[in-house]
């Protein structure tokens, strides 16, 4: 079987294969900022291998709450169809248009959720989302806000029943009425 690998040690706004959408930008430190750093806005926002058995990634990020400890809405690492466009903001993390399970939107996301929406547990958590924002698996997580860099390593099996032949790999983050700033490193 053939392996595909890529690594970003820092980011450049003119970098090949880096698609910045909505509020995302690369700052002067080479950090990818996924949400605006400022006043909150209401409701703001591979390759196929037929024997693919799992997907592995590692990344680091910072979540900060400049004006409050009540932060919304979170960060998601996702695999989705290549033509994926930003969806609803706020609790939908820019990935989904509603709460319905939609097999036509073949996607997998790992969310670092900082706000309890009506479909979420009443705690910050890490969730595994397949074709819907309603997590299939949830682990409570005490989110650390501020300048502390958090590290994530993800290993999970990928089903060809969930993902299309080609996918876009990316990050999405949104804020709602409560401000939050998300950076990946």
Curated annotation (Swiss-Prot):
User: Transmembrane residues, as ranges?
Assistant: none
A Gene Ontology molecular function term of the record: carbohydrate binding
Q: Which residues bind Ca(2+)?
A: 113, 115, 117, 120
Q: State which residues carry a glycan (glycosylated).
A: 48, 122
Which cystines does this chain contain? none
The record's section on PROSITE patterns has: LECTIN_LEGUME_ALPHA (PS00308), LECTIN_LEGUME_BETA (PS00307)
Q: Where does Mn(2+) bind?
A: 111, 113, 120, 125
Pfam families for this protein: Lectin_legB (PF00139)
> Which key words are in the record?
Calcium, Glycoprotein, Lectin, Manganese, Metal-binding
Which family does the record claim for this protein? Answer: Belongs to the leguminous lectin family.
Record note on quaternary structure: Homo- or heterotetramer. V.villosa isolectins are composed of either two subunits a and two subunits B (A2B2), four subunits A (A4), or four subunits B (B4). The predominant form, isolectin B4, has no A1 erythrocyte agglutinating activity.
> So what does this one do?
N-acetyl-D-galactosamine specific lectin. Binds the Tn determinant (GalNAc-alpha-O-Ser/Thr) of the tumor-associated glycopeptide. Could be required for agglutinating cells such as Tn-exposed erythrocytes.
What additional remark is attached to this entry?
A: Binds one manganese (or another transition metal) ion and one calcium ion. The metal ions are essential for the saccharide-binding and cell-agglutinating activities.
What protein is this chain from?
Lectin B4
- Which species is listed as the source? Vicia villosa (Hairy vetch)
């Amino acid at each position: 079987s053939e392996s595909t690998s890529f690594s970003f040690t820092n980011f450049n706004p003119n970098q090949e294969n880096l698609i910045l959408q909505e509020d995302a930008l690369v700052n002067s430190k080479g950090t990818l900022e996924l949400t605006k750093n400022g006043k909150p806005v209401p409701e703001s926002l591979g390759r196929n291998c037929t024997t693919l058995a799992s997907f592995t990634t590692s990344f680091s990020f910072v979540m900060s709450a400049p004006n409050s400890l009540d932060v919304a809405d979170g960060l998601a690492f996702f695999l989705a169809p290549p033509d994926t466009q930003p969806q609803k903001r706020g609790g939908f993390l820019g990935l989904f248009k509603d709460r319905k399970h939609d097999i036509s939107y073949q996607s997998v996301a790992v969310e670092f959720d900082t706000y309890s929406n009506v479909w979420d547990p009443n705690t910050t958590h890490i969730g595994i989302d397949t074709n819907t924002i309603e997590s299939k698996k949830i682990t409570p997580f005490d989110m650390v806000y501020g300048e502390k860099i958090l590290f994530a390593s993800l290993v999970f099996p990928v089903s060809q029943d969930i993902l299309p032949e080609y996918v876009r790999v990316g990050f999405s983050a949104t804020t709602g009425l409560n401000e939050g700033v998300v950076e990946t490193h």
